[in-house]
């Protein structure tokens, strides 16, 4: 059940991100994001990732709770996680464009690994999360491209 939930959340958030791009600029994928206010990047990212990465492992336990044991509760819970993960993808892509990477589609693969690492044993999950965190920590030392 958790694996199914993982795929629903990941692909749902990719569809939501593409829909947002289509509504705002007419294309499903774009690289012309305006520069993100970098001083708030880690704050936004921390909030959204904490919701996704802290709540998702509890999915199997939450199904025993009365408020999510219904079909409507489950659907609402999954929709909240989809929106949160879409926000993570949007912020991550904007951050990569902000440092000068022109086509950061591969970030969706990193997001897939981060979301999927919840299903892996603890040691493998730690390695994946720490390696991605190291990449994010190294990124601010790169030259910043002004996308105005």
Question: Residues of each region from the PLM?
Answer:
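The cytoplasmic-loop to transmembrane-helix boundary for the fourth helix
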Residues: 104-115
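Membrane-helix interface segments in multi-pass membrane proteins
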Residues: 1-18, 51-85, 113-135
